[in-house]
Amino acid sequence: MSTVKEKLIENLIEEDKISQRKITIVGTGAVGMACAICILLKDLADELALVDVAVDKLKGEMMDLQHGSLFFNTSKITSGKDYSVSANSKLVIVTAGARQQEGESRLALVQRNVNIMKSIIPAVVQHSPDCKMLIVSNPVDILTYVVWKLSGLPATRVFGSGCNLDSARFRYLIGEKLGVHPTSCHGWIIGEHGDSSVPLWSGVNVAGVALKTLDPKLGTDADKDQWKNIHKQVVESAYEIIKLKGYTSWAIGLSVTDLVGSVLKNLRRVHPVSTMVKGLYGIKEEIFLSIPCVLGQNGVSDIVKINLNSDEEALFKKSADTLWNVQKELVF
């Protein structure tokens, strides 16, 4: 006897079961789920897979998203503890890791999260050998290096969310000070995603007007408007949010989704993401730091060669030294 489905639908051809824009998110904590909902609402994936060790929470998050399927255009949402669920992903986003505690620097997290990466990355690569990997877990620059080493993938296909969020915060705060929307305020933060990040005051502009031409002291101690406090706010903002609500989630979820769009749509937009900087600006070690990168379907296809002034270059090198002093002690 025919089923209702058989009476209703006649199959004509077998469809290709391999997704064209499959995304896997490893880690379904606050950051992972913020990434998930932003990606779904932007219609960036035709399949979304969630992976976590907390099986009950994982199933609950999957069901909660599936029940909202009417309101977005991703046809398949799956989850599992086993990495086979991530097979054939175009992009794997790693958010798993120990959460940063109130007052804890991102660098203090490092060895705990290195050990977590060792349990994740080989399985990811086994099931998706052609994927790009976007690392979000903190400290993101060092963990991007660790993932690159563990994965065996080309450095161009492993990149960290890096200073994309720092730069977004920077532009928001500049806009607040000027009364202008952040999309019209242009400025970059490079280096470490964290305490030693480097604001490029020399490039800050609105409508092509460099603020440094209006006040050469902009961003320095001699600046009467104290613009340097904006960078201080950028550095301290995550700590403040963690103190207030326990974690950060929404802004990083939006920032990651911004990067995902550039990769899956092959937009070739320029983002400050964490990439290999050995050989740049006098850096001799295998360090990952944020510099402006062209992001597309192959990952990081190009870097933009910024002309740093002497102060900016010194700060960038200091940022590299800060990370190297931690990174060289890692065991993995």
UniProtKB/Swiss-Prot annotation:
Phosphoserine modified-residue sites: S301
Enzyme Commission number: 1.1.1.27
Keyword Repeat among record annotations: no
Location of this chain's protein in the cell: Cytoplasm
Molecular function terms, GO-annotated: L-lactate dehydrogenase activity
Top-level EC class: oxidoreductase
Positions contributing to NAD(+) binding: 29-57, 99, 138
Active-site residues (renumbered): H193
Main location: cytoplasm
Gene Ontology biological process terms from the UniProt entry: ATP biosynthetic process; flagellated sperm motility; lactate biosynthetic process from pyruvate; pyruvate catabolic process
Pathways involved: Fermentation; pyruvate fermentation to lactate; (S)-lactate from pyruvate: step 1/1
GO cellular component: cytosol; motile cilium
Keyword terms, alphabetized: Cytoplasm, NAD, Oxidoreductase, Phosphoprotein
UniProt keyword annotation of Ribosomal protein present: no
Binding locations of substrate: R106, N138, R169, T248
Known role: Possible role in sperm motility.
Family, similarity comment: Belongs to the LDH/MDH superfamily. LDH family.
Protein name: L-lactate dehydrogenase C chain
Gene this protein is translated from: LDHC
